């Protein structure tokens, strides 16, 4: 049986139908593109945050190890090592006779180490006595705080030689930020073993 067609009817789409279809298609493509770019930006921010977190944690681990050894003086009789040589809110210099040879080494592994925050470059520097080296970049803040045997905060900074001799623990707070990622802050309290 043959299908009856109306006179004047033509198979196909009208221009209005094509324009409506293209408009819907453009809206869907636009939404998908927006989602793709948002996901990419989120992934980049997440990766940046993970990078700065890892770098801050690694640096905190290094600092903890070296600061914990401040004042090491295993010789008998002791040579009188001064553990905390200089201390203010952004700089800390420590010494310890880690090797037990009676001499404070300034070559790696150094027994006289200075950590300092350089605000103008956003870096944390480590100076083992042979020159400062950046150990952490992209930081927006670093603070040292010093505590005595009763956990009381020692002030004012920089600490006098008398107050530096009272230091039993050091609080460290590092804030880092990379790119447009959210800032990351890590804090630690390090007990000096040799006090």
Region locations from a protein language model:
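A generic fold-level signal
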Residues: 10, 55, 86-87, 167, ...
